[in-house]
Amino acid sequence: DDLEQAVDNSAATAEVVTQERQVLHNILDLGEISVEEVMRPRSTWVTLPLPIHLDDLDPQSIDTGFVVVGGDGEIVESIIPLDHRASLPARHLERLAEEVIPVPWCARLAPVLQRMRDTFSSAACVVNEYGEAVGILTHDDILDTILSPEPSRARRLLRREPVEEVREGRFEVQALTTLRYLSRRLDLDFEPDPEDQVTVSGLLQEQLERVPVVGDECQWQGHRIRVIEASGRGPVKVLIAHED
């Protein structure tokens, strides 16, 4: 019995060591990953005008975990966290609003996390070169990037696995998936270029130079990517297969 217990403890210890190494690896990656890869894109959150009451919250805002306090739409100045909904008042939720810090889309996660800690901010507004809000990054988003064995923004937003193998060597992929995560799933030796697109959708748009529609294709890292589902804004889902 003692020997079996020792073996079990050894296996458990090895698993813990593996997890710790992965966390350390993820922490080191914070210096390389841009906020654009982790942020929640503009179309994924809800903005509500003042005043904001509990009855105004819809399922999307609850799933997102926060609601943006209404403004001019070009910049996000504050959000209302919804992590503890049971303790929220019925009226005037805007009184609980927290200011967000602005950060450029090209910033790396490590300095942004440090700035959030220094300013006691729970979220950052990601802005493009014109000062327009293109995304929101929360403290929880960064924690997920650190603690998850395979960090994925698409999985976090969609609440399902964004890359599914439908047949051997053929994958259905959500277009929101980052190329960094996709390369890990496909076991590719790929390091994202800070100057290039970060998602499957962005890759398609860059290569085609237009909004992709169903049937459009492009090539990437020895694979062919074909759009199998799209909306008016662009691709939603693609099929990826290795080129023979």
Language model segments and positions:
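Soluble cytosolic regulatory domains appended to membrane proteins
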Residues: 1-244
